Amino acid sequence: MKVGEDSNGSLLIDNLSLTTSAASIGNNAEGSITLTNHTNWQFDTPSSNIFLGTNEGSGTLYVLEGSKISGLQSIRVGEFYGDARGTLVIDGESSSVTSKIAIIGDQGTGKVSVTNGGTLTSLTQMNIGYVDAHSSLSANQSSYGEVLVADKNSTVNAPYILLGGYNTSSVSDTTGILTVSNDGVINANSYIWVGVSSNGTGMLNIGGAQGEAAQPAGSINTPRIYLGGTNASTTSILNFNHTNADFVLTSYIDGKGQVNQVGSGTTTLSGSNIYTGDTYITKGSLRAGKVDTFSPNSDYIVDSGGDLDLNGYSQTLKTLALAGTATLSAYENGHEFTPTTLTINGNYTANDGLLVMHTVLGDDNSVTDKLIVKGDTSGSTRVMVNNAGGLGADTLEGIKIVEVDGLSEGVFSKEGRIVAGPYNYNVVKSDNQNWFLTSEIPAGP
């Protein structure tokens, strides 16, 4: 079946069952096919393909109202030429496309949206803005692929997903973007690779796309998210741009790419993450779901609107630049207090950041949260200390809350009153190095 082959054309198929061996939509022209009202389109040969937008063409396929496509070897959306444009829309409960492989943006521009309960399934792999080696390469062509999965019961399934890159030297640049929002679901039972090779850009968005307003999150079910390719020209970004108060990512994140918390929601990480790129928290909260889930290989930058929340789980970071909030423990009155330690292997810098801690306010031996800096400290930090059930007591040296191994030039000052019983506590520097809580009983009137 060919629609839009060298001349423009369109086709509407309503409530039919049909079987074909292949389809081309928009080859050197504009073409579109719309399936509605539970149409069932079956492909019957091992090499069956659908091409959407090839050469200089523009091809669009709408799969709507419970319609289904199955039996495909491949579905190829935007392929073989820089001006090729392909669009696939799967919309509506039970609307689905199933193929052995799905290729979106291979030397062309491909866009896919899966919404309102639709499903796209690739049985082997899904390439988004990724150029595979094949016989139809055109030299120095760019590739752009974008997939949106949105709304409840909307699902993308693939063993693994590749975003932005190539395994051949005959392309100039590639971009692959995958966004999941508003209860959409991505299932990749092996991994998602974000930014595969040099000159490749890969972006995985939970919630809104980068630069757009935050959206309710979707979910990602994959054991591994790999950020980054083989050299510095690869761009790999994982964006948490959502509004959910309870989004949890269980995947482990590795590679060289960047992690951004940019939405107003709370993202809880619970994988054993080891990525080496920077972590930016500009808005909302990045929260720990277990001990050592924050990557110890990453530089953390917390802006004034962001919160790095250890949530009662001790963590180790490479460096920390704090202009926002770092919250250590999560104590509840009447419960036993377990202290939390934030260890910085490198330097700690602050720009009026807020460090929130809990301490059983008593004598020098009191149990407390602690900040340990192996490198140097600089800048100003406000310290809010909440009492975890202490009754107050005299201190001699004090309760150590900040330990500095390197050059101790940072200033830590008390934020609000720190009180237990008749005692007031102050944040003071001792031995020109570390910071302590020291107690006093204020003089009477």
What are these regions (language model features)?
Residues 1-5, 24-26, 48-55, 76-81, ...:
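Extracellular glycan-interaction patches encoded by glycine-rich segments
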Residues 7-9, 16, 21-23, 29-33, ...:
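The right-handed parallel beta-helix/beta-solenoid scaffold, focusing on the short coil/turn
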Residues 28, 38, 55, 66, ...:
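Generic structural motif
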Residues 81-84, 133-142, 167-173, 198-200, ...:
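Short, solvent-exposed loop/turn segments that connect beta-strands within catalytic domains
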Residues 205-207, 213-220, 233-234, 241-242, ...:
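Extracellular beta-solenoid/beta-roll
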